[in-house]
A protein has these predicted regions:
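A detector for small-residue-rich transmembrane helices and their helix-helix packing motifs
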Residues: 1-209
Length: 209
């Protein structure tokens, strides 16, 4: 069957987009600590999008972080999983996947927060896109073992499933974590992998035959 525009593959390139993304995130973090209003401009705040039409926040929220440890944990995850995924699928595919899943996770979360009345919620961080990257890593390397906290061995698919349940039940608690963004990142990651890459994650994980 001839490829459509949805699943047409890019020519393989490797320009280390992972490092570029990390650098951008670090630069933004430095700037937002110099210009104190910048986090509210870049973060996704539903009331600003609704009333001020700041639609760029659907994209920019994933480059803004609340503090150093938030930035460090996300960039560490991106460094660990991102480079391997990028080398496997190519830089262009990697960037499209990362930016698209992150943006769609932001848009979906916006409508869910709007529906729930949480319009003053401030959403920021690369976690939605990072969850999608972890998902793709687990699909490409289903037998890979990840050491949680550096000591607990766990197969990559098990880790992703564990994170899913943590965020699913975590959304019912007011703990300041954007669980909806995490879950949306996983959802759009699954759709991207299934529709564009024509890979069934459950088959890759050995759950389905």
């Amino acid at each position: 069957m001839r490829n459509t525009i949805i699943n047409r593959r890019f020519k393989y390139t490797d320009v280390n987009a992972t490092s570029i993304l990390i650098i951008i995130n670090v630069v933004v973090f430095i700037l937002q600590n110099i210009f104190t209003d910048l986090p509210y401009i870049l973060s996704m705040v539903p009331v600003y999008i609704k009333l001020k039409h700041w639609y760029w926040q659907f994209f920019t929220y994933m480059f803004s972080h609340v503090d150093f440890w938030h930035l460090f944990s996300n960039m560490l995850g991106l460094f660990i999983f991102g480079r391997i995924v990028e080398r496997s699928v190519g830089s262009r595919e990697f960037l499209l996947y990362y930016l698209l899943t992150g943006t769609l996770a932001g848009i979906t979360s916006y409508f869910l927060y709007l529906y729930s009345g949480s319009i003053f919620t401030v959403v920021l961080g690369a976690s939605g896109a990072l969850y999608a990257i972890m998902l793709l890593f687990s699909v490409l390397f289903p037998n890979a073992v990840v050491y949680v906290f550096g000591i607990i061995p766990m197969r990559a698919p098990i880790l992703v499933i564990l994170y899913f349940f943590i965020d699913f039940f975590g959304q019912f608690k007011a703990d300041g974590t954007a669980h909806l963004v995490h879950l949306s990142g996983l959802l759009f990651g699954i759709l991207y992998i299934t529709v564009r890459m024509k890979i069934n994650p459950l088959k890759q994980w050995g759950i389905m035959k």
